[in-house]
Amino acid sequence: MSAAPEQDTGHPHHIDIQDDRVSPREDDEDASHGMKNSKGWDGKLRISKSALLSNPEALSDPEYSDDDNVLPGDEIRADEDLLESESSDSEEIMCTHSRVRSIASLRLDRFKHVARICLRQNNIQEIEGIAPLAATLKDLDLYDNLISHMRGMDDLKNLTSLDLSFNKIKHIKNIGHMTELKELFLVANKISKIEGLENFGKLTSLELGSNRIRELRNLENLKSLEELWVAKNKITELTGLGGLPNLRLLSIQSNRIRDLSPLKEIPGLEELYISHNALESLEGIEQNTRLKILDISNNQVSNLRGLEGLAKLEELWASYNQIGDFTEVEKVLKDKEDLTTVYFEGNPLQLRGPALYRNKVRLALPQLKQIDASMFSHLTLP
């Protein structure tokens, strides 16, 4: 399913992904100038690192419409079989970037054992022709198509993963019967309201980044949810999270959050990505003592008060804030034995003396292995 990027024909493309087997990860386009955590992740949304995005406005503008940016090409001819080489016993069908307009034209009913279907980056407008596979189908991936409505999936009761990201969907509907779902990806659509999730007690990951959502609501039945990705929306408050006892990761970059105090409702949180918001203080985060990774970059935070009790903290991304006191940094962070990575670039404490900045941080926090983009196998102080 690998495909080399097409030559530029003068027409705008969607996304060219060289390896569609890499699950795209939610993008927060501004994940702060090269910052990466210990696993090499830079805080961006679910887009493969090999993706070539030639219409970036699709991510930055929630009002963006790609009606005029469809790949040129003719509909599949009646006698053309794109799946001719596939065995009838195949458990995985992949047909990506092939200008498919109709799922029915693929005649999927001949494959009796299919567990996964991936039809990414096509021109599909309607979900159809999949019902005959309902008994075996577990994973349906229709990422980057032209789908406006969540219809045609009434028989798909055994799905555990559904990806309808980068489509034109406005409402989450007609999937309440998918009670086995564990992963639901609806990134970069036109969704303004979280709804229709009442029956998803087994859901562990929900991705709704790059939509038009203003409020976190209707999540209380998601008792198994571990990861919630809602970056690049219009959310102003962290309310509505109290019914998520297993939430481990919250990605809410590029919203309008000012107050962290509602986080006390999710004390089990281990990773919080809240860059590019309107934070001026970290007060309210004190009860999240299980936090291991905290990204507060690109806010207006002037001090680290609130982090004193976060003994398990491993990574702190705090670039481009208003932090200026080395003494306070040492006081708050020096006792955190697991802390290995910090980012403070773009703060007054770095801008005032960039030549001495890293050495000062190393002296204050000798347990570190990484300061900004610089990694150390062993810190040898001058």
How does the language model describe each region?
Residues 1-148, 157-170, 179-192, 200-214, ...:
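The feature captures the LRR N-terminal capping module
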Residues 150, 172, 194, 216, ...:
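Conserved ABC ATPase nucleotide-binding domain signature region
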Residues 244, 266, 288:
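Metal-dependent phosphoesterase signature
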Residues 276:
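Short, flexible active-site loops
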